[in-house]
């Protein structure tokens, strides 16, 4: 049942942020490619297997054994034993799952607001209850995109490279600002009682803070009474 609500504005804090979907990436990844037609004589590893640095990966018909350049996990084997590998084609992929970062792609307008060391809030769909944080490491152009590299403080062990994450990059935090309920705003206007007089005023909105929104520039006074229909 709808009811008329009257409430005074409150003071609070708001955070202006850039929101984007990011992807977890490994700090160390390696793709083995060969430079000549070669037959795989033997595989020493399988997909999903953890290997140590310098562990043997595969043996070719030239008698060459290729080894792991670092400790990690085999994430892809593209060929089986006895198959011929053509030059420059990926043979296997090795990834360090323990050291990761996050890559976010932004449009130009959002990218202009990003600076190194800005705080970032991270949220994974399956573990929304966990508060995860990071910082902006760098921003750079790549292939017509503007990419942001985020270094997380820590990530749960179940988070793997190529998983997606919601990111909120903190641009600015403002304290002691005037906030009014979002529900009180209709078509960019709000109805107020000011010194025993009812008024409907057009307002400019600032940042959101849950169900409240910032009203900058003194448009709403602390003693105003906000009148609206609560559904």
Mark where each language-model region is.
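N-terminal beta-strand block that forms a small beta-sandwich/beta-barrel module immediately after a flexible targeting
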Residues: 1-38, 44
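Conserved hydrophobic positions within beta-strands
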Residues: 9, 22-24, 40, 74, ...
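Periplasm/extracytoplasmic soluble domains of Gram-negative envelope assemblies
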Residues: 25-29, 35-38, 45-47, 55, ...
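Short conserved beta-strand and strand-loop elements enriched in small hydrophobics
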Residues: 117-125, 167-169, 188-194
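Structural microfeature recognizing short secondary-structure transition sites
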Residues: 124-126, 130-176, 211
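Acidic- and glycine-rich mobile interface elements
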Residues: 151-155, 176-178, 189-231
């Amino acid at each position: 049942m709808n009811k008329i609500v009257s409430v005074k504005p409150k003071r609070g804090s708001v955070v202006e942020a850039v929101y984007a979907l990011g992807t977890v990436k490994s700090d160390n990844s390696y793709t083995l490619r060969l430079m000549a037609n070669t037959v795989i004589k033997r595989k020493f590893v399988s997909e999903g297997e953890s290997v140590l640095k310098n562990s043997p990966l595969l043996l070719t018909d030239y008698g060459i054994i290729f080894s792991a350049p670092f400790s990690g996990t085999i994430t892809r084997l593209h060929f089986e034993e006895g198959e011929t590998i053509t030059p420059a084609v990926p043979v296997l992929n090795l990834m360090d799952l323990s050291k990761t970062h996050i890559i976010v792609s932004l449009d130009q307008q959002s990218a202009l607001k990003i600076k190194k060391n800005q705080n970032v809030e991270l949220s994974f769909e399956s573990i929304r209850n966990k508060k995860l944080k990071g910082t902006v490491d760098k921003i750079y152009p790549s292939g017509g995109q503007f990419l942001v590299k985020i270094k997380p403080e820590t990530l749960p062990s179940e988070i793997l490279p190529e998983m997606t994450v919601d990111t909120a990059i903190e641009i600015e935090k403002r304290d002691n600002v005037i906030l009014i309920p979002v529900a009180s705003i209709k078509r960019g206007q709000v109805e107020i009682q000011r010194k025993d007089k009812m008024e409907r005023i057009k307002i400019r909105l600032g940042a959101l803070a849950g169900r409240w929104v910032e009203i900058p520039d003194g448009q709403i006074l602390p003693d105003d009474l906000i009148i609206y229909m609560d559904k």
